[in-house]
């Protein structure tokens, strides 16, 4: 497996780029080591962290797992607090569109791009899937040409309600209206376990996930 390729989501000079270069919205693309002429499915991964950080154990390990099994694993480094709504949503939508735009470069089938999210990243993935056009960023020049809607969705212990809790405050800020909280709620075990390799009752879930993805036609 090759080392990841870093792709910045927004061009130099964009107001979406924080001052700290380590916080610049970007994707890390992990490709399978074996080359193939056949386009492959891709999974865009949104790590959790309560919209205040991004948990490392919910990003790179899964991208490498997917790449080791012939898929393209992509970690999405989206903006978090104090960058409130719509910043994370704009980054996730941009990431989906960017993957489809760069599909020939990375050997991706643009019709088989999944999104995966953990905890707050699960909320971001769920929102991208159910409300891909919730916020149309005026700086996203890819929006007229590429869809942000994923072809499959993988939610691992996701946050689905924005009606209470710090996760909502970190996304929307302290002055958000009830209407905004409801709009960000997608709902009508164990948390933060990542691959759960040390939990016998859960450790098989990554294998089941790979089996499910291997049959993606």
PLM regions and their residue ranges:
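Alpha/beta-hydrolase superfamily serine-hydrolase fold, recognizing
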Residues: 1-217
